[in-house]
């Protein structure tokens, strides 16, 4: 048996598991496509299915090829925006996905090369071409997601200027990034590439 843990989960929990004799495989946050591929392969080795891991890596490589063929004609500035104003910086999987498709991550112009929070005022002042969000609902579940429906953002970013990739496809690195890339390509086609 093996317990898979993120390096950023509670250290005490990981230590307890190790003291209990559990084999703990610790994974860092994947910040690039190469990191994702390495982690897929590592997980395949851990569970005794390196062949399945290679299938997923090949699937991701094929999605990258499709995405590069559909590269945006214009280097649109896109801000990946989540609840409470969280933005994905240059050192994120989201930024890697944007780069593959010829888009640029607008977080850097907000002064954030790493992921963090941006104010509504900074977002409105910067005016990226599009915002990338995880759903297109017009009702907020809580105050954090209500920011995405703020009148200023709705005015600047109506549905035609919002790109949607479901959170479960891009929140972490893994085999689902193939689907995230395909979804991003579909979103690009909505604006004519």
PLM region descriptions:
Residues 93-115, 135, 161-164:
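His/Asp/Glu-enriched short active-site or ligand-binding loop at hydrolase and phosphoryl-transfer sites
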Residues 36-40, 49-50, 68, 73-80, ...:
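N-terminal hydrophobic signal/anchor transmembrane helix of membrane proteins
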Residues 52-103, 170:
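Basic- and aromatic-lined ligand-binding clefts that recognize polyanionic substrates
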Residues 1-46, 117-161, 190:
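Acidic/His-rich segments in extracytoplasmic proteins that coordinate ligands and/or metal ions
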Residues 18-22, 45-49, 61, 65-72, ...:
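Sec-exported extracytoplasmic/periplasmic mature domains
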Residues 7-11, 30-38, 47, 51-54, ...:
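Soluble non-cytosolic domains of exported or imported proteins
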Residues 5, 26, 80, 105-108, ...:
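Structural signal for conserved beta-strand scaffold positions within catalytic alpha/beta enzyme cores
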Residues 15, 38-41, 45, 58, ...:
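Solvent-exposed, polar/charged alpha-helical surfaces in well-ordered, non-transmembrane soluble domains
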């Amino acid at each position: 048996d093996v317990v898979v843990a993120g390096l950023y989960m509670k250290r005490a929990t990981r230590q307890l598991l190790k003291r209990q004799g559990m084999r703990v495989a610790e994974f860092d946050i994947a910040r690039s496509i190469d990191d994702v591929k390495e982690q897929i392969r590592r997980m395949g080795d851990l569970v005794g299915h390196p062949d399945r891991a290679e299938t997923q890596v090949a699937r991701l490589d094929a999605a990258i090829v499709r995405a590069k063929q559909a590269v945006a004609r214009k280097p649109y500035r896109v801000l990946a925006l989540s609840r409470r104003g969280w933005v994905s910086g240059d050192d994120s999987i989201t930024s890697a996905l944007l780069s593959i498709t010829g888009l640029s991550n607008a977080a850097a112009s907000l002064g954030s090369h790493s992921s963090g929070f941006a104010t509504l005022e900074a977002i409105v002042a910067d005016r990226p071409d599009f915002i990338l969000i995880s759903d297109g609902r017009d009702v907020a579940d809580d105050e954090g997601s209500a920011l995405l429906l703020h009148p200023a953002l709705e005015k600047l970013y109506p549905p035609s200027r919002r790109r949607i990739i479901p959170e479960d496809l891009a929140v972490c690195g893994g085999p689902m990034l193939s689907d995230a890339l395909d979804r991003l390509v579909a979103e690009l086609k909505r604006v004519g590439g």
